[in-house]
């Protein structure tokens, strides 16, 4: 259904509050288009017409999580709810409300206030990384296979990593092992935590997620601090022939902390380190 160079209208049909500032938005595709047709880890662009310009933002859907391929095996009992072909897709978006210090997130506030039944436009896919399942990736047109996958994610950068995790763990034929670092300010900022916890619990050891908080309260029993070399080495798979790393998060965290630590450990950009 998606087209890279043509905007297509979709209708907002549901908005569900997940936390004080996070919503799950369900959009309905045009009547004759049941499939979104997005590759795992890819993004859609949302476009909203302002008076003098078009506001555009990219998001990775949190549904569908599996391609429309009825012959594939799934380890999930609610297969239809996560598989493409329903005529809808879901975005999980954190709303950055305006304050005295900053104007807030333009698109997230538009979505938060948009009436149910109103239309917005989408196009895509964007993103050069596609997870094909069972460790196979197509990255900028080149094929890669990784048996072990490391993810370094921050804030809303969790969403492409979540789509990869879901695809790998919902497919009963996929044997890929995944280690993830998910960095946030506080516990309430962790997107999709319940879903990640459920995937980890049901993974039989294939998935391990390390949440690290920079502004945790006394009740937080997990990892505290920032992403650094020690955390990366303690939480992720070490460099190896079939080990890849995928990154998505704030530029400061990625450029100043994660990438230097990964390089020093022995990983190489565009060989086994990639950004969503």
Where are the regions that the model predicts?
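Hydrophobic/small residue at the entry helix of a nucleotide-binding pocket
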Residues: 156-161, 254
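Reductase modules of NAD(P)H-dependent flavoproteins
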Residues: 176-276
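Ferredoxin-reductase
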Residues: 2-118, 184-186, 214-215
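Short, Lys/Arg- and Gly-enriched loop/turn segments at beta-strand edges
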Residues: 52-60, 127-136
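Conserved beta-strand elements of the Class I
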Residues: 148-152, 246
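Short, conserved phosphate/pyrophosphate- and ester-handling motifs at nucleotide-, phospho-/glycolipid
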Residues: 41, 157, 250
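Histidine-anchored nucleotide/phosphate-binding helix
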Residues: 160-172
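Conserved S-adenosyl-L-methionine
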Residues: 146, 169-178
């Amino acid at each position: 259904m998606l087209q890279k160079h043509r905007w297509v209208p979709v209708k907002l049909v549901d908005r569900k509050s997940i936390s004080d500032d996070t919503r799950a938005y369900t959009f309905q595709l045009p009547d004759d288009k049941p499939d979104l047709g997005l590759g795992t880890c890819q993004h859609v662009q949302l476009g909203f017409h302002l008076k003098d310009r078009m506001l555009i933002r990219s998001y990775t859907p949190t549904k569908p999580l599996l391609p429309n391929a009825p012959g594939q095996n799934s380890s999930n009992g609610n297969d239809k709810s996560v598989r493409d072909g329903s005529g809808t897709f879901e975005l999980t978006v954190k709303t950055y409300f305006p304050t005295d210090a900053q104007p807030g997130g333009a698109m997230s506030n538009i979505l938060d206030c948009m009436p149910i039944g109103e239309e917005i436009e989408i196009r895509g896919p964007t993103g050069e990384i596609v997870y094909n399942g069972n460790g196979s990736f197509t990255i900028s047109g080149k094929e890669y296979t990784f048996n072990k996958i490391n993810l370094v994610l921050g804030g809303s950068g969790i969403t492409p990593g979540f789509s990869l995790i879901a695809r790998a763990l919902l497919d009963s034929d996929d044997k890929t092992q995944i280690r993830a670092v998910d960095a946030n300010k506080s516990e309430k900022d962790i997107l999709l935590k319940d879903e990640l916890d459920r995937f980890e619990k049901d993974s039989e050891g294939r998935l391990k997620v390390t949440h690290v908080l920079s502004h945790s309260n006394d009740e937080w029993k997990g990892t505290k601090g920032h992403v650094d070399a020690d955390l990366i080495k303690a939480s992720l798979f070490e460099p190896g022939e079939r080990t890849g790393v995928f990154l998505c998060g704030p530029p400061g965290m990625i450029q100043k902390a994660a990438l230097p630590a990964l390089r020093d450990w022995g990983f190489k950009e565009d060989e086994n380190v990639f950004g969503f």
